[in-house]
Amino acid sequence: MTHFPVNIASDKQEFDPERWAKTPTTESSVNGENGTAPTSGLPSRHPSTGISVLIVGAGMGGLMTALECWRKGHDVAGILERSEGPVYSGDIIVMQPSAVSIIRHWPDMLHDMKAEQVHAVVSYETHDGRHIYGPTVPSFNDPEHLETRKGPFVAPAQVRRKFYRMLLRQVARCGLRVEYGKTVKSYFEDEKDGKGGVIIATTGEAEVRVADIVVAADGLKSPSEILIAGQHVPPRSSGLSIYRTAFPKDLAMQNELVRKRWSDSPPIWEYWLGPGMYLGVFVGDDIISFGFTPRDDIVEGTATESWEPDTDPETVAQAMLSGAGDWDPAVLALIRSAPKGAIVHWPLLWRDLRREWTSPAGRVVQVGDSAHSFIPTSGNGGSQALEDAITLATCLQLAGSSQRAYLGTKIYNLLRYERVSCAQKMSFVNSQLKTGTDWDAIWKDPAKIRTRFPKWIFQHDPEAYAYEKFGEAFAHLLDGREFVNTNYPPGHEFRAWTVEEVWRNIADGKRVEDLLDGDWS
């Protein structure tokens, strides 16, 4: 079997800060005015807080935490990553404006993102080729939402590899180094000394690292859960899984049916909706990506939470045909054009959200998937991880000193928990929209098929919100004064919920969207 090269650790020295101290703005040889090299610019740093921050995990949430902590005046004591080098897993991602508005402060990343994001249109089809709606744009780019937006224009799609490399370049330009091959096996804190720490797995004597604040950005099943919650949160099956991949467009265009449908197409993101399943197809200038989401009773075999690309394209095609025998032939041809060794089969597992994301003394704090997992089809996991990073760095800045840094983590947790809980519930809304489609309603008003991107999510500014609410949150934690978050749906009366509760409603034939109180639009 010929394997497509994905999920392989790349050169760990490529982003050494010494290589990026005086480089052009982008990877490409873009010229500045009159043929000169463009200048590279770092944002102004806020005054030093004296707070040392150790970050575990060099995914997008961890890297953005490092960048924003650097900008806010904290001392980034290290970025530890268990992989042996950068790993470019994943394919096409959605980044919502709330997460990337902060890039307006970063000139290099602003330039890179504008140059590299994909201006695709979005279209919706039935599995057998009947057109439903589109071409259109994500609702966050409807004209009425663009006039007052801060930060860069946000295209419908980001190529994950390019977005991730943009963050790695910026980290290097700030003089920060990712330490690869560092597997953290446990977290601890010392309340008396006001420190958090980690123990790194080694073949010899254990390596210990400490800082005022330790940020666990190491994803699902982070060892930090043991310190914070006492145990790992068990996952629950959603009854769905996803096959996903990305590969060079040229490979797919060797097939006549694929060429006939997509060879002259501008960049497009299509959703093909079938009975109890759907397929997302992204066709860009140089890559093709797809994600097929069936019910578990349609497929054979068991998916595992691993980005190991070990699924044969024909397995995906047969799973599609077992659920519906009349798929559009061009779609099946596209699936079969994927190279072997490039497709991941990932279970869509849910984990009930924990209220606490910090250790008892507040010296260890979680961001991203380690705090709150989102299923890969949510279109919101990366955005919420970046919102976490921005909020945490700002709260630490407002805490003001290493002695009070623990208050910053506690306030960050208070500001984020309810918002993330509501954002997770939107994942159910969008999943049900595509796998349990109300066709009578859709054919009467096809625009209702659009993926839901709520205003309360994409119009949020996490940095401004932290500045606005820090004082109230501080008073709440110290004196018990009333505190109300305003970063979730207007009019919604927040209450905690469980995955089991939502699935019980779905099993009873209820639509999650119909059960929401307040304005979730």
UniProtKB/Swiss-Prot annotation:
Gene Ontology molecular functions: FAD binding; monooxygenase activity
Superkingdom: Eukaryota
Enzyme type, top EC level: oxidoreductase
Keyword Flavoprotein: yes
Keywords: FAD, Flavoprotein, Monooxygenase, Oxidoreductase
Composition skew (Polar residues), residue ranges: 23-48
GO biological process terms on file: monodictyphenone biosynthetic process
EC number: 1.-.-.-
Function as written in the Swiss-Prot or TrEMBL entry: FAD-dependent monooxygenase; part of the gene cluster that mediates the biosynthesis of monodictyphenone, a prenyl xanthone derivative. The pathway begins with the synthesis of atrochrysone thioester by the polyketide synthase (PKS) mdpG. The atrochrysone carboxyl ACP thioesterase mdpF then breaks the thioester bond and releases the atrochrysone carboxylic acid from mdpG. The atrochrysone carboxylic acid is then converted to atrochrysone which is further transformed into emodin anthrone.
Family: Belongs to the paxM FAD-dependent monooxygenase family.
Protein name, as recorded: FAD-dependent monooxygenase mdpD
Organism: Emericella nidulans (strain FGSC A4 / ATCC 38163 / CBS 112.46 / NRRL 194 / M139) (Aspergillus nidulans)
Gene: mdpD
